[in-house]
Amino acid sequence: MAETSIRNFNINFGPQHPAAHGVLRLVLELDGEVVERVDPHIGLLHRGTEKLIEYKTYLQAIPYFDRLDYVAPMNQEHAFALAIERLLGIDVPIRGQLIRVLYSEISRILNHLLNITTQAMDVGALTPPLWGFEEREKLMVFYERASGARMHAAYFRPGGVHQDLPEKLVEDIGKWIDPFLKTVDDLDELLTENRIFKQRNADIGIVSLEDAWAWGFSGVMVRGSGAAWDLRKSQPYECYPEMDFDIPVGKNGDCYDRYLIRMEEMRQSAKIMRQCVERLLGKERVGPVSNMDGKVVPPKRAAMKRSMESLIHHFKLYTEGYHVPAGEVYAAVEAPKGEFGVYLVADGTNKPYRCKLRAPGFAHLQAMDFMCRGHLLADVTAVLGSLDIVFGEVDR
């Protein structure tokens, strides 16, 4: 009988694929149903953000950051604002810090709700996304009531936040927390001990801690492998040192552990939010929400009607913008997906000389080949879901 040579089978996964989370194209080399090679093709959502930022003043560059990881927009603005504040040497008043932390944690919950529920949908559970989007809708309303926009808020400004929160809004956020924890428990009940969900995620995409560091992982990907590394604790910024919360850590480094960590992180975020709400309604009830330096933060409308200097400041800030002293700085925040960093080079003008964005998803996506090799085709979606990739920040 004549020998037939068996060759591997190449297929495209995406860019139009429901589990590809946007515009991912993976070229998979399959031996039967076993994945031999994964080749991610990125750049389909490249918009030249880093170059565009160089042609905008520091204030005008802020909206670009919302459009990177558009699932949790305010966390990126936060990193950019911190970078500028370090170069300018200004600090944020405590009420402004509390509002920032409150909204950073809202963003984290927005992100984890989407990720957990769509990961469940990728492996076949159809109920969680409906619950997740219901809660996300309420959070988007909180975004809208603070900044006027549901997603691209441009709310964090260098020096603080754009506007103060109405008391009613802070109270409503406080009232939202307990029903939300009930929803998390319902999700927990539906997925955590679910036999099918466990079979699809446990022991899939295992990453040892050494490999996690070597691939440049951060965030949930590192904590899933057993390191308690969270920038909110290890390199604290804003008023996180004053907050009481725990860092969930996995021990197997598989998709299931990463799912469990995200579930617990939502509870911890709610805990941080509760502390912020208590302080915003308690001893930090009144106070400035942004730095009072008129050379950086625009004056209030009321002041502009009375004072010529305020009017001049306002005009200069919105036409020319403030000049940032020459220097370079790296500021990183613990975004929901990992360490989101901004490396900013200032040359003393009103525009950044260079702004490099360190997107956590980029490092995670490049390990796709390493994580999927030897797994089955059906496991690719499970691994991809647990990486938590959004293409706005990967392609920039």
UniProtKB/Swiss-Prot annotation:
GO terms for molecular function: NAD binding; NADH:ubiquinone reductase (non-electrogenic) activity; quinone binding. Coiled coil: none annotated. Keywords: Cell inner membrane, Cell membrane, Membrane, NAD, Quinone, Translocase, Transport, Ubiquinone. It is an enzyme of class 7 (translocase). It is found in: Cell inner membrane. GO terms for cellular component: plasma membrane. It comes from the Bacteria. It catalyses: a quinone + NADH + 5 H(+)(in) = a quinol + NAD(+) + 4 H(+)(out). It is a peripheral membrane protein. Its EC number is 7.1.1.-. It holds the Pfam family Complex1_49kDa. InterPro entries: NADH_Q_OxRdtase_suD (IPR001135), NADH_UbQ_OxRdtase_49kDa_CS (IPR014029), NDH1_su_D/H (IPR022885), NiFe-Hase_large (IPR029014). Gene3D superfamilies: Cytochrome-c3 Hydrogenase, chain B. NDH-1 shuttles electrons from NADH, via FMN and iron-sulfur (Fe-S) centers, to quinones in the respiratory chain. The immediate electron acceptor for the enzyme in this species is believed to be ubiquinone. Couples the redox reaction to proton translocation (for every two electrons transferred, four hydrogen ions are translocated across the cytoplasmic membrane), and thus conserves the redox energy in a proton gradient. Belongs to the complex I 49 kDa subunit family. NDH-1 is composed of 14 different subunits. Subunits NuoB, C, D, E, F, and G constitute the peripheral sector of the complex. This is NADH-quinone oxidoreductase subunit D. It comes from Chelativorans sp. (strain BNC1). The gene is nuoD.
